């Protein structure tokens, strides 16, 4: 099925239907997780590194269609199904009046697969 192909990026496909994959990415170092895509032909990659405790969910949005070839790597505090569903799942974060919450993450590029381990 398609679930096993979440990390496969094929040629653009006519009629491809966009998909969202929910990934449980474990913390690797300093409670951070990361996701990356690397194009061996172009020798170019992009990564997102995030605090696993703050960002409890991660979605990969994938569209491999002709003229619409894109992927989104999306750390989040809830799944992208809306506030109602987040409330039902106990994931909706409510801030008190004037309360602030800061979330940080890192996005970067790399040119060598081996350098990914140093992120």
What are these regions (language model features)?
Residues 1-47:
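Active-site/ligand-binding surface loops and adjacent short beta/alpha elements
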Residues 36-119:
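Active-site pocket scaffolds in enzymes
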